[in-house]
Amino acid sequence: MKGDPEILQSLNGCLKDQLTAINQLFLHARMARNWGLGGFNDYEYGRSIKAMKMADRLIERVLFLDGLPNLQDLGKLLIGENVPEMLGGDLQMLTDMRARLQDTIRQCEDTRDFISRDELSEILEETEEHIDWVESQQWLITNAGLENYLQSQMEV
């Protein structure tokens, strides 16, 4: 099935965001594990795997629409040197990702590509859940203190 060139370009933009997320979240997970923060590691690692699965879905969709998935284009990684910076970088990445997803969903609606819209809507839901988690962690750090938060994330 031949896809709309603008939709294919936008889907590749969403793919770029997921590929960037895989790398950023994976590195944050491994940094946290190195610091003994098993809980933080587990969540970030799990999210990097989810990003990989979402990227796979986008690759499949682009191929189905007779497009060429661009796996070479990556965004800037926002790597933090400590947990608050990691959360800030993740939040920035996720809010940018959400904006692109929302724009692409609207574009799919306008071109009547409802299958791509539905795929992107599921990815948007996952992204918003991740944003909620990051904002909750930031709230915990602000209200319980960084030391207490880090202690709660340590391996037992």
Regions found by a protein language model. Give the residues of each.
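Iron-associated oxidoreductase/ferritin-like identity signal
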Residues: 1-156
